Amino acid sequence: VKAAGHDTQCAVAAMPWDGIGEAAFLSCGTWSLIGCELEKPILTRRSMEDELSNEIGANNQINYLKNISGLWLIQEIRRNFREEGREYSYNDMEQLARTEPSFACFIDPDASEFAQPGGMPEKIRAYCERTGQEVPQTDGALIRCIYESLSMKYRNAIAQIHENTGKKF
């Protein structure tokens, strides 16, 4: 038995999957890792261009995955709100997001301007303005923008994994 090398690999190895059909995983923390298990790595140019990687997991299974900026954006915007005197729990933030219209604007969570701490509300607004989208004005709209942008990023990653593996999730 070969042990998994880090926490995400351990979580993937422990997934309750009955072996019927295809299964994908999403490990979402500061970073998000989304992918599937394979018996052999995929080493194609397309896979490389899609920024998909092969990691050896438990029992020599391949964790074929994409790294995505995850809840870092939520953690950072929460810190920015706190600095401005607005203290929100994560539940509060979810409720604020639920009050806003859906699909008003999207960001690329992996865009370089979001990698550094500080000024996240302004960075999101500037991104939306620069890309000709509705600019989020409220805390809830900013939060919803992040959550929906992550969801779209995950959807796109699953599509890339499907295109590279042929697996349907």
Where are the predicted features?
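Active-site core segments that coordinate phosphate-bearing ligands/cofactors
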Residues: 2-169
